[in-house]
Amino acid sequence: DEEEIIEKTLGVMRKECYLLHNVDILSNCDFESLMYYHQHSPNINATLLVSPRKTSRYLLFNDDNLLCGWVNKDTMETKPAGFRYREGEYQEYAYSGIQVTTPKILHLLPKGKYSIIDFYLSICHRVDIQCYVEDDLQLLDIGKPENLEKAEEFLSKF
C-alpha cells in the first residue's frame, strides 16, 4: 500500500549516507564502525573521523560531540568568524580527511575549490556535525612523494 511505500522510502533516506575520503590518505580506520555510528545518530548530517593526535590545528566539539569551531594553537586564529576559543571548554581533535555525510550536506556543498573544513565550520551553527573518535587512528599522507615508499610497510601492518 502507499503508506508502506512511503515508510520504506523514508527509512532508506534516513540510512543513506556517503563516505568521503581524501584520496591521498591511508588509514587503519574501521569504516564499518564509522558508518554504523553515523547511521545510528539521529539528526546528524555529517560525522567527521578525528583522533587525539598532536597537531597545531584542532577541530573543537562540545559535550554533545557537535562541531563548534576550529583553533590554530600556534597563532590562536579561530573559525568560524566570531567564534571565541576558551581553553578547556571543548574537546579538541585532529581531523583525518575522512567523513560520512548525508545527501543534505552534498546539496549544500558550494561549487569550486574550497576547504571542506571551512565549509563545515560555515554551517555548523545550523547543521549538526558530530565527531567519531578513533584513539588509535594511524594515518599516512601518501600525497607526499617521500611517504609513497612507506605505504607498503604501512599497509602490511593491517
Residue ranges of predicted features:
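A short, conserved acidic/glycine-rich loop-to-beta-strand motif
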Residues: 41-52, 57
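Alpha-helix N-cap/loop-to-helix initiation residues
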Residues: 2, 27-28
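Generic hydrophobic alpha-helical segments
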Residues: 5-9, 13, 34, 41-44, ...
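Catalytic-core segments of class I nucleotidyltransferases/pyrophosphorylases
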Residues: 17-19, 26, 32-40, 53-54, ...
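Short phosphate-binding loop-to-helix
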Residues: 1-20, 79-82
